[in-house]
């Protein structure tokens, strides 16, 4: 790829014309790439583990969180200086504090296999490039939402969200073109933003 520079620890994507309003969607693009990378590596190793995305940016394996993603950006009204996407993937962690071990896990604890991080990084880079290209073309998630929704752990299931100091209970329908979660409630559809 001619729009990527390798720096040894990760890929540095050269500047694209992304509006600051759309940059937060890169977190969802990264979540898709991490989910696909973990799924690919585990499948290649013969594991049938359920790896999904918990909206908007957590990766869960067998319903336990194995990865969190954060995005940091420096921008002006119409110009992005930089976007940094950070991911913490629990690859070979062997134990967790009692306070989180019911909800957090690692690829090792879920599969019993020590995995090479380099395989996950390589699979992530390949997946991110694919999803990033689609995102840059549309400047939203229109071309990715079908794939994202198929990766969503609670799509069609009951969810509870706190939004604007109100509890919203309903069924998760998936995301829209902006990455907002659509929840069907008794009062109609509600849009949840991050």
Task: Describe the residue ranges of each PLM region.
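Single conserved hydrophobic/aromatic residue that forms the stacking wall/gate
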Residues: 2-13
């Amino acid at each position: 790829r001619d729009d990527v520079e390798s720096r040894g620890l990760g890929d540095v994507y050269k500047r694209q014309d992304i509006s600051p309003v759309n940059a937060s969607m890169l977190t969802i693009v990264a979540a898709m790439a991490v989910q696909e990378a973990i799924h690919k590596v585990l499948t290649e190793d013969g594991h049938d583990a359920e790896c999904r995305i918990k909206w908007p940016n957590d990766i869960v394996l067998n319903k336990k969180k194995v990865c969190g993603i954060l995005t940091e950006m420096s921008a002006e009204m119409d110009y992005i200086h930089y976007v940094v996407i950070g991911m913490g993937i629990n690859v070979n962690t062997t134990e967790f504090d009692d306070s989180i071990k019911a909800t957090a896990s690692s690829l090792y604890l879920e599969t019993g296999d020590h995995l090479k991080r380099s395989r996950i990084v390589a699979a992530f880079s390949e997946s991110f490039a694919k999803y990033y290209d689609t995102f840059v073309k549309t400047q939203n998630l229109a071309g990715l939402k079908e794939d994202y929704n198929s990766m969503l752990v609670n799509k069609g299931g009951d969810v509870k969200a706190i939004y604007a100091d109100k509890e919203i209970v309903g069924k998760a329908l998936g995301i829209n073109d902006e990455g907002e979660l659509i929840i069907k409630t008794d009062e109609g559809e509600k849009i949840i933003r991050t």
